[in-house]
């Protein structure tokens, strides 16, 4: 009987020894930049560039869409992607990562001198030809 009572008294004590979520030493690692959405637009034009533009900033968004032939469609697609992303901790940015027949499956995101840089992952099985070139725009979250 004493063993059962001792065990019952020990359980709440051990539960009280759980980690403290307010302890800064136990917080999750710093957030990493991540791909939020890959937009694929047919015949949008543009230029592949690793420079990422913060699309929630009106000036940056305007500077980004100026590089496209079909500015209105690109602006609408990027704005919809921002809306679809919902509330996020970091800032959303866009970069044109590929133009051609293939859509990259992922991207790598690094810190550049002036702004984040986004580069397409290597295409593992490229298509030889396509009906119309597509422009791949990576929308990424930068913590």
What is the predicted function of each stretch?
Residues 54, 58-113:
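Mature extracytoplasmic domains of secretory-pathway proteins
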Residues 91-143:
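Extracytosolic low-complexity repeat regions of secreted or lipid-anchored proteins
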Residues 18-21:
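Bacterial signal peptide processing site
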Residues 13-16:
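C-terminal motif of bacterial Sec signal peptides marking the signal peptidase cleavage site
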Residues 1-9:
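N-terminal export and membrane-targeting signals
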Residues 47-51:
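Flexible, solvent-exposed extracytoplasmic
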Residues 8-11, 124:
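A generic, residue-level signal for flexible/boundary positions that often mark functional hotspots
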Residues 25-46:
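Post-signal peptide N-terminal segment of mature Sec-exported envelope proteins
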């Amino acid at each position: 009987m004493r063993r059962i009572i001792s065990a019952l008294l020990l359980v709440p004590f051990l539960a009280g020894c759980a980690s403290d979520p307010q302890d800064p030493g136990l917080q999750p690692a710093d957030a990493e930049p991540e791909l939020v959405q890959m937009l694929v637009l047919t015949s949008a034009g543009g230029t592949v560039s690793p420079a990422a533009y913060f699309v929630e900033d009106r000036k940056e968004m305007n500077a980004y869409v100026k590089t496209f032939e079909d500015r209105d469609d690109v602006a609408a697609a990027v704005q919809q992607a921002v809306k679809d992303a919902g509330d996020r901790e970091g800032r959303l940015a866009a970069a044109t990562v590929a133009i051609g027949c293939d859509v990259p499956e992922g991207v790598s995101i690094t810190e550049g001198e002036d702004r984040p840089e986004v580069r397409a992952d290597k295409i593992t099985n490229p298509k030889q030809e396509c009906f119309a070139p597509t422009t791949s725009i990576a929308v990424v979250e930068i913590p």
